[in-house]
């Protein structure tokens, strides 16, 4: 199970791996991407510098299997980076940075099927593809083609090229080494971590058009310093790994900051969400940690008199709830007894 030293302070349910890198089963050398197989209760971890994928049980973190080895031939990996599971087509998709291609593996058999792409900037060419995501509603595969500073859209039916968007820059729908991509299926959106622009961009998954962005460089709540991984939870909240600020941050689907998780973690790189179990997995220090999403977001949300007043807009669901909040704040203010951190124990009522 590895080093569980964070459990006491961070409510981490389980940890996989050790701080020391290695090549044994259950040990990593640069875990670079995560994907939950929600139907089988498995967590797939891309073990980048070991050029393989390891598979673990979501129940206890025990090692289940592995596949892949270093090389340039089909079915071999050269610094794999991103991973996505396409349940509709029994498919695992994996991007390779140094082979500049995308591999397709059977999900049920964990066996190689095919690969596409080579280095370049053409329709089916890539330059350091970092991540991959599945847009199940529009039957598309979306590749974060990092050094080409673009998103490439493929058909998930036959993995054919559809179109691409983006170029290098800092304007809307421009990128500077985008790291990872996630899909908000309910709102038909693509969420992209724009690493060197220190922001997250939100695009339409229908045509790739720009919708809005959030984040700016800094270490205040809601600011980012090289955002890398991201995922969407079952309430539409956007979870971002804030690499140089050594924390995870949660935002509403509108991009408003909710909460931060920074209890002793260092250099978090990627994050994934298990919608069936309500779990968030993230990587740091050659380990994979798993926490409860709802517990983190409820337990760490605080109202701070020295910052923004009241609760974020997503909490304002009923008139009675807001009346209760305002009444509580007004009463405490009148008595001059507002504590530094007033915990809102009202999540069970929302």
Sequence positions of predicted segments:
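Short loop/turn segments that connect beta-strands within beta-propeller blades
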Residues: 58-60, 106-110, 155-158, 205-207, ...
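Conserved beta-propeller blade signature
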Residues: 43-44, 91-93, 140-142, 190-191, ...
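Blade-level signature of beta-propeller repeat domains, shared across WD40, Kelch, NHL, RCC1
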Residues: 267-300
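Cullin-RING E3 adaptor/co-adaptor recruitment helices
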Residues: 295-350
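Residue-level detector of Asp-centered blade-edge/turn motifs that repeat once per structural unit
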Residues: 36-40, 85-89, 134-138, 183-187, ...
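Short loop/turn segments immediately following the C-termini of beta-strands
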Residues: 48, 97, 146, 195, ...
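Gly/Pro-rich loop segments of beta-rich domains
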Residues: 2-32, 61-81, 112-130, 161-179, ...
């Amino acid at each position: 199970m590895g080093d569980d030293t964070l459990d006491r302070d961070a409510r981490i349910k389980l940890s996989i791996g050790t701080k020391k890198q290695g090549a044994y089963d259950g040990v990593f050398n640069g875990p670079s991407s995560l994907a939950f197989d929600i139907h089988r209760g498995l967590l797939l971890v891309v073990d980048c510098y070991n050029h393989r994928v390891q598979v673990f049980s979501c129940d206890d973190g025990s090692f289940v299997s592995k596949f892949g080895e270093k090389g340039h031939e089909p079915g071999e990996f050269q610094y794999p980076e991103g991973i996505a599971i396409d349940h509709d087509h029994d498919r695992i998709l994996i991007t390779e940075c140094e082979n500049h291609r995308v591999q397709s593996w059977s999900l049920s058999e964990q066996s190689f099927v095919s690969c596409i792409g080579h280095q370049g900037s053409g329709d089916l060419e890539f330059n350091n593809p970092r991540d991959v995501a599945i847009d199940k509603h529009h039957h598309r595969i979306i590749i974060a083609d990092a050094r080409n500073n673009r998103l490439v859209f493929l058909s998930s039916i036959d993995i054919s090229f559809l179109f691409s968007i983006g170029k290098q820059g800092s304007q809307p729908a421009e990128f500077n080494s985008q790291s990872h991509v996630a899909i908000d299926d309910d709102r038909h959106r693509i969420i992209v971590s724009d690493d060197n622009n220190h922001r997250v961009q939100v695009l339409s998954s229908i045509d790739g058009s720009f919708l809005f962005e959030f984040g700016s460089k800094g270490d205040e709540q809601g600011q980012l310093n090289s955002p890398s991984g991201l995922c969407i939870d079952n309430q539409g909240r956007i979870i971002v790994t804030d690499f140089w600020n050594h924390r995870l941050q949660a935002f509403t689907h509108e991009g408003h900051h909710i909460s931060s998780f920074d209890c002793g973690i260092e250099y978090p790189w990627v994050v994934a969400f298990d919608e069936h179990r309500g779990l968030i997995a993230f990587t740091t220090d050659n380990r994979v940690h798993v926490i409860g999403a709802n517990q983190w977001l409820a337990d760490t949300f605080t109202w701070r008199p020295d910052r923004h007043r009241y609760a974020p807009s997503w909490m304002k669901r009923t008139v009675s709830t807001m009346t209760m909040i305002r009444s509580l704040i007004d009463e405490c203010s009148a008595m001059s007894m507002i504590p530094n951190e007033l915990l809102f124990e009202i999540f069970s009522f929302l």
